[in-house]
Amino acid sequence: MVVNILVVNPNSSKSMTISLQETIEKTISKESCEISYFTGPNTSPPQIDGQETSVQSMKACLPVLTDDKGSIYYFQKFDGILIACFSDHPLVTELKDVAAKEKSNVSVVGLLDSSIQYCNLVGRNFSIITSNKEWIPILNASVQSKFLTGNTIDKNLWKGTVSTDLQVLALHSPDNFQQIADIIRDENLRKLDSEIVILGCAGFSGLQNKLAKKFEKEGTLFLDTIEVGLEILITMIKFVRSQK
């Protein structure tokens, strides 16, 4: 049976949504998933670069997804919702709370929680590469306070966050690829001794294979958070359906 998923880009950049769609269509079978895409309204920021814009985007998106039952984006019309922003985005928690109050079985995941849980299960050294420097303390605090297992902490597998010092929309530019690769080599691999590098921003979407090829000799695993988030979401949906 086909699962019905909504991918939410909580910022107002339509180009980012198009990039997400292009990446997803290359990796997820249309035979198994029907995927719709939502871009934040004009009241959402064009890019999310910290806590303030995260909250702003949540306040802009939540009413569109939960208030109008006739909307094509009404959350209960979907089996699952992926919030495509790499952060502890408040929209994830808010949607889960609304779903719980309305006793809905819709599954909701974000990119940060799903990718960190994947790394917890794999059990290898991992770190994050992100966009601007403002994200370093935010992501480190979120990961350390909410998402690490006891085993990951005991084995010191979590190595921290590295910034490219680039804005979100600049990450996808081919002109910046070498700069990103150099930072990963110097910081994530050599300095932090990471075996897994989480591509910690939706702006990295589609770069997983290119980076894997660049670092083939090192054997580094690059985690495309969109792909991991979707696969985990699909598994959650199938499990919920199996209980019916």
What residue spans do the PLM features occupy?
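N-terminal glycine-rich phosphate/adenylate-binding segment common to multiple enzyme folds
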Residues: 56-99, 109-112, 195-208
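Short hydrophobic segments within beta-strands
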Residues: 8-10, 38, 128-131
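N-terminal beta-loop-helix "entrance" segment that forms/cooperates
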Residues: 37-63, 168-174
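Short, hydrophobic alpha-helical segments
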Residues: 122, 188, 230-242
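N-terminal beta1-alpha1 ligand-phosphate binding loop
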Residues: 3-28
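Eukaryotic N-terminal targeting leaders
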Residues: 1-3, 241-244
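Short, acidic/small-residue loops that bind anionic groups at enzyme active sites
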Residues: 95-122, 214-233
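Active-site rim beta-loop-alpha module in soluble metabolic enzymes
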Residues: 130-202
